[in-house]
Curated annotation (Swiss-Prot):
Protein name (record): Imidazole glycerol phosphate synthase subunit HisH
Broad class of where this protein is predominantly found: cytoplasm
Keyword Hydrolase in annotation: yes
Organism: Aromatoleum aromaticum (strain DSM 19018 / LMG 30748 / EbN1) (Azoarcus sp. (strain EbN1))
Every Glutamine amidotransferase type-1 domain range: 3-212
Complex formation: Heterodimer of HisH and HisF.
Compartment(s) where it occurs, according to its Swiss-Prot or TrEMBL record: Cytoplasm
Reaction(s) the record says it catalyses: 5-[(5-phospho-1-deoxy-D-ribulos-1-ylimino)methylamino]-1-(5-phospho-beta-D-ribosyl)imidazole-4-carboxamide + L-glutamine = D-erythro-1-(imidazol-4-yl)glycerol 3-phosphate + 5-amino-1-(5-phospho-beta-D-ribosyl)imidazole-4-carboxamide + L-glutamate + H(+); L-glutamine + H2O = L-glutamate + NH4(+)
UniProt lineage: Bacteria, Pseudomonadati, Pseudomonadota, Betaproteobacteria, Rhodocyclales
Domain of life: Bacteria
Length: 212
């Protein structure tokens, strides 16, 4: 049995996630896997990914991973990253596709009308680079991470939870958006902890020790 299963549905380079977790938890068994049985048996699950939402949902289903993701998200420490966060919600404007429906709400694109910086210059989409993450509620995943710490983002869409109680952090890029959500055993982030230097490594270490 793996201590941590990183779900591989063919979207994104997952080795960087695995290497970061192995760095903070050298004694743990980390599996990058597309095998539903390995995911089901793991103590903790990481659901990362990059790419377009329609492609991600299709590849997830082609590998028969939909149900095991839903089961894991209901039963064990579960970390969603980037598109892995977005897929947890009910619907995405990207391709007008349904998500997994694990969390209430949708996924929306940065509004063009608001993509203006304080100096009047246009903000580019995708939002790419370092940005502050403002913590909106206490959570064990924030342990040792200062409020307004900077994390690394690459995205054109963001989650819009239907339940405000889900919001664990917000960030600003032309508009204020939800950058982390939390409910029970689920914690999911829009940014990339594996690309976010020491703060990101601390978050991954927190995930390894988190006991929801």
């Amino acid at each position: 049995m793996s201590d941590v299963a990183i779900i591989d549905y063919g979207m994104g380079n997952l080795r960087s996630v695995a290497k970061a977790i192995e760095h903070v938890a050298p004694g743990k068994r980390v599996a990058v896997t597309s095998d539903p049985a390995v995911v089901a048996a793991a103590a903790r699950v990481v659901f990362p990914g990059q790419g377009a939402m329609p492609d991600c949902m299709r590849e997830l289903d082609l590998r028969g991973l939909r149900e095991v993701v839903k089961t894991a998200a209901a039963s064990k420490p579960f970390l969603g990253i980037c598109i892995g966060q977005q897929m947890l919600f009910e619907h995405s404007e990207e391709g007008n596709v349904p998500g997994l429906g694990i969390l209430p709400g949708g996924v929306v694109r940065f509004p063009d009308a608001k993509m203006v910086a304080a100096d009047g210059s246009r903000l580019k989409v995708p939002h790419m680079g370092w940005n502050e993450v403002c913590q909106r509620k206490p959570h064990p995943m924030w342990e040792g991470i200062p409020d307004n710490e900077r994390f690394y983002f690459v995205h054109s869409y963001f989650v819009a939870p239907a339940d405000a109680a889900l919001v664990a952090a917000e960030s600003d890029y032309g508009t204020r958006f939800t950058s982390a959500v939390a409910r029970a055993n689920i914690f999911a982030v829009q940014f990339h902890p594996e690309k976010s230097a020491q703060a990101g490594l601390k978050m991954l270490a927190n995930f390894i020790s988190w006991a929801p």
